[in-house]
Structures are given as structure tokens and as C-alpha cells.
Amino acid sequence: SNYIGAHGQYTAIVKHVELKMNNDMLKDVEIVDTPGLNDPIISRGEITKKFLRECDVAFLLSYTGQFLTQEDINFMCHTLPSEGIRNIFIVGSKFDSGILDDNKSKTIEEAERKSINIYNNQAKNNIDACIREAINSEVLVRIKESLPPSYVSSILYSCSQKRKNNQSYNAAEANVVKNLMRFQGFQDD
């Protein structure tokens, strides 16, 4: 956070950060994690917009707690270029939070299914509403074609890796696992 955080000591002078992996599956693949388009450092947001015109694929991450709101979609329509990007993937992040918002389901499978249905419908309805308003419809159509979204939970992924390596959870991970235990069928193994 000293290098890329909004209040980092070196944030203002960092142009980019490169990480390399020795993995044959990633040969000739370049993955770029750009700052968000609403980055607090305005120049980085502008660099992101320029860079998107050169990308083949864009992964649009949206926190499931406020998943793909009309404001998010309008923002994407005004900032995503209509040229360059050939494929768009929508990813709902922190999916564990979405599941935990379900106060009625008894089983983890039911909570997962209901959460996915809620977020899929929300994404479709909000995109359709923006299409009706005719905001950058070319980009909207490409976003709609990418439905349904995929959902991820980095905290549960971290838990699974720690469980596999016999490591302890940190406080946040332990709390999520504890809260998910209320669902029948959820197993911490």
C-alpha cells in the first residue's frame, strides 16, 4: 500500500508495477491489473482508459454487496472504449458476503443458488434498463452478451489453500467460515 494505495508514500511516483511468474500456462499471456476507472489518482484512471483500447479481454469486477448497479453500468458505458476489447467477463467478487446475506436458506447449496439468481437477475435488469436509456449501446450489448457473471470469493479461496497446507486462518477468514457454518452442508475441510 506504500506504492499503490491512495495514501501511499510512493503512490504519486509509481507508474506501474510488474510481477512475473514462471508458469508455462501463462506463456505469451500478459495480464494487467489496472487501477479502477475511478481511481483516486486521476492520472491512473486516464492511463487505464487509454490502455483498455489495446486490450483483448476485460474482466469487470463488482462487489456482490452492491452488485452491478445502474451507476456501475452507466460508468462502464461512458469509460469502456467501443473498440479494442473483444471479450468482457463480469465477475462478482466477495461472493461469500452475498451468501451470508441470505437469512432464509437452510443449506449452503440453496443459499448459493438463490444468491446467484438474485445477482444474475440484478445484472440483467440493470443492463436492460441502461439499454432502454440508449447509453453507449454497443458496449452495453457486449456487456449483456457476457452474462451470466462468474462469482468468486478470494477469502474462501485463501481458506481452501490454508486448509490444504494445514495453516491457520486469520481472523477475517475464521469469521467467514464460522458464519457459513450456519448453513447445512457447509464443510470446513
What are these regions (language model features)?
Residues 1-189:
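Globular "head" domains of long coiled-coil molecular machines
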